[in-house]
Amino acid sequence: MTYRLPFVAVILFVTAKHVVLALENANWIEASKTVPSDSTQTTRVAYRRITGGFNERFLRQLEKKPGVNDKRDEERANFFEAVFKNTLFNAFGYRSDAKAKLQDPNSNIFVNLLRRIFVWWAKNKPEFNKNADMHKEAMV
């Protein structure tokens, strides 16, 4: 047990550090949206306040500005979604096939656990159901 103690200590330290940094970041963002603090200064020329954070107008402009890589990001997301679905289909097949393989007494326990997760996840996904197209045609 003593050989795991440094590893656990490092994990706890890194987790605590991330939590502290996230809280500081959240406080900084929240402070930039509220009333300016005492540390704000005025310039001699324009008499406007200089704050350390982003103001709301700048953030709104960033939201409205179209991203250069929006289309590329969408294509990349669609590609990874297709790869994910193909990998799942190659691993488990249709949902009904995965249900049938769950009943097999010779199958691996770990693989059965993955199959159960897949069956639960794919219950509302028409691309993983064999009879989804037939149901659609019958309803039309």
Curated annotation (Swiss-Prot):
Record GO cellular component, one term: extracellular region
Keywords: Host cytoplasm, Host nucleus, Secreted, Signal, Virulence
Keyword field contains Ribonucleoprotein: no
Signal peptide stretch: 1-22
Residue span of motif RxLR-dEER: 57-76
UniProt KW Membrane keyword: no
Compartments, as annotated in UniProt: Secreted; Host nucleus; Host cytoplasm
Family: Belongs to the RxLR effector family.
Domain notes: The RxLR-dEER motif acts to carry the protein into the host cell cytoplasm through binding to cell surface phosphatidylinositol-3-phosphate.
Entry function: Secreted effector that completely suppresses the host cell death induced by cell death-inducing proteins.
Protein name: Secreted RxLR effector protein 37
Originating species: Plasmopara viticola (Downy mildew of grapevine)
Gene: RXLR37
